[in-house]
Amino acid sequence: MPGDTVTALRELPIEPLTPEAFAAFGTVIPPTDNGVPLGTGDARLDLSQGTPRFYVMRIPGRGFTVTRITRHCKVTQVLASAGGKSWVMGVAPPRAIDDPSTEPDIEEIRAFAIPGDVAVMLHKGTWHIGPLFPEGTQESFFNLELFDTNKVDHQTCDLSARYGLALKLVTA
């Protein structure tokens, strides 16, 4: 991690994804049969702050040691593997989404193994790391956000600069 000032490496266990474990961060969207009516477990999207953008993003694998975490405060974001492969995501609960100086509580960061046949919707302001998968690979992901999310609604906390910390997401 060139340029980073990491003084500590903290292991973060990767947990199995369940709707209950993920509830503070967003909604797990499992496969459902076609024609099933809207239910209480369905994701409630908020795309009201702009024009929605749905696209397939190609991401190089960076491995599982990370120093940055990001959030989007104006939109819910939906992510899913386009190839049906499992992946990993780190998350921290949203806090004070109207305050751009707010940073994540590093003690609340958790990591989840996301099965390839589900999507996740992140609450507005949920801090996230990933999608992550092994270094040297490349994967495609479905992404639903706003057309300008990455330009006007992209707050990143550099864990190495702020806390001297890198997180290594490890199998529990």
Regions found by a protein language model. Give the residues of each.
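Non-catalytic, conserved peripheral segments adjacent to functional cores
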Residues: 1-107, 111, 149-172
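A short beta-strand-loop micro-motif that forms or neighbors metal/cofactor-
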Residues: 126-158
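A short pocket-lining beta-strand/turn micro-motif at the edge of beta-sheets
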Residues: 85-87, 110, 118, 137-140
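Conserved metal-binding segment of the jelly-roll/cupin
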Residues: 113-131
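Generic detection of intrinsically disordered/low-complexity segments and helix-coil linkers/edges
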Residues: 16-19, 121, 127, 135-136
